[in-house]
């Protein structure tokens, strides 16, 4: 574990702030300029559509009666705390994992503020093709998904590199 926070993954915390600010500013813009369910086509497959999500990703548990607001609040605080602790333990050079953790934290905190302030998450990025629609989402959701993908990619690359090192060590041992 790095002895100084400046040598740890916490050096990447600026990304949390960047994601959080971009997410909150975009949502404030939507709230100021759109009526609920109002939609503006930007491209033949992409709209800004203001929707309220009372659940999680893909509106999971959106009709659960209200308890989910506090459940997802607890989950966001818990994961953000855990990932921040892990960032403190990571060397700052582990950029892929540090970036992944900060993207997830920034997204979780962005949606957390919505839940606490409004009781729902503001979604507005709406992709579709003909009659097939992908559920609307926001910048925080995107950051969480990209962060999760980076965690998976990092684990695959780390496992591959570990296997290469082990094979190299076995080769060197066999030559002696």
Curated annotation (Swiss-Prot):
Its EC number is 3.4.23.36. Pathway: Protein modification; lipoprotein biosynthesis (signal peptide cleavage). GO terms for cellular component: plasma membrane. InterPro entries: Peptidase_A8. The active site is at 123, 141. Pfam families: Peptidase_A8. One of its GO terms (molecular function) is aspartic-type endopeptidase activity. GO terms for biological process: proteolysis. It is a multi-pass membrane protein. Belongs to the peptidase A8 family. This is Lipoprotein signal peptidase. It comes from Shewanella woodyi (strain ATCC 51908 / MS32). The lineage of its organism: Bacteria, Pseudomonadati, Pseudomonadota, Gammaproteobacteria, Alteromonadales.
């Amino acid at each position: 574990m790095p002895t100084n926070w400046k040598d740890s993954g916490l050096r990447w915390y600026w990304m949390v702030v960047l994601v959080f600010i971009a997410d909150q500013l975009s949502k404030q813009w939507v709230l100021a300029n759109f009526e609920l369910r109002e939609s503006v086509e930007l491209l033949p497959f992409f709209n800004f559509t203001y929707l309220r999500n009372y659940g999680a990703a893909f509106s999971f548990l959106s009709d659960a009666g209200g308890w989910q607001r506090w459940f997802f609040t607890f989950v966001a605080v818990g994961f953000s705390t855990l990932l921040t602790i892990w960032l403190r333990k990571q060397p700052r050079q582990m950029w892929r994992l540090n970036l992944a953790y900060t993207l997830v934290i920034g997204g979780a905190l962005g949606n957390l503020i919505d839940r606490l302030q409004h009781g729902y998450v503001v979604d507005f990025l709406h992709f579709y093709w003909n009659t097939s629609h992908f559920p609307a989402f926001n910048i925080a959701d995107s950051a969480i998904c990209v962060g999760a993908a980076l965690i998976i990619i990092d684990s695959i690359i780390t496992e591959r590199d570990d296997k290469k090192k082990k094979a190299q060590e076995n080769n060197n041992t066999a030559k002696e």
